[in-house]
Amino acid sequence: MSINFVYINSVTQELTTLTEKLDVSSPSECNDTIKEIRELWEKSIPLFSLSVSFREIDYLGETLLALSAACENRDEVEFERYRALLIDALDGVSRLEQFSIVNIL
């Protein structure tokens, strides 16, 4: 089992947990949590880039920026949209890193 596999799945799980706990109705808490997510994400990019495509990395970063803007603007509809997209993208990265017959072929 690859160390990068373990690292990526651990970080995506932590990012997903933080993203799920975001609450747009509490702007200061939302901004603090997004800052925590962003710091973890930026710290993780070098190891992610060893096996995750730059397209996926860029998409995660862009979605996080959009989520941050929705939080700042208290736009609940956009906030929920980008939160769902970020969680789905994190799940996709995690799935791509799993060992399976589909990924091997």
Describe the residue ranges of each PLM region.
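Alpha-helical transmembrane signal-anchor/signal-peptide segments
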Residues: N4-L22
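Extracytoplasmic/periplasmic/luminal assembly and interaction segments
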Residues: C30-N73
